[in-house]
Amino acid sequence: MSPFDRRSGGSGGPGGWWILFEPELHLGTDILVPDLAGWRRERMPLLADEPYSELAPDWVCEVVSPTTARIDRVHKMPIYAREHVSYLWLVHPGLRTLEVYRLEGQQWVVVSSHGGAEGVRAEPFEAIEFDMSRWWLEEA
């Protein structure tokens, strides 16, 4: 069981999250597909039967590449802010970095930046330390 799956009152991590890979989000008139998205279970107690969600997630993670960087930053970030997504991670495999953003009002604020093979505790998952060295492909 993942620490994100732990039910309330259990042990082993923060629990209380649904984390989905490439969920389809219908946010107003916009349809977005982040690389990862997470909802706190108190906001979404059950996963919907529909193949999409109209409920904005609490956290999104975009894996940035040269072909998606502009879309992620210029198009998606303002929509996530408009829809009150609380946290946004931008993972840059080419740079081996993680940028962590928190929404304050309608503005994204950089909370922290990490790189390389660090052990990371990043909002909103500070209870877990992520080993960033496991995120990157081995160099040839």
Give the location of each predicted region:
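Gly/Pro/Ser/Thr-rich low-complexity, intrinsically disordered segments predominantly at protein N-termini
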Residues: 1-140
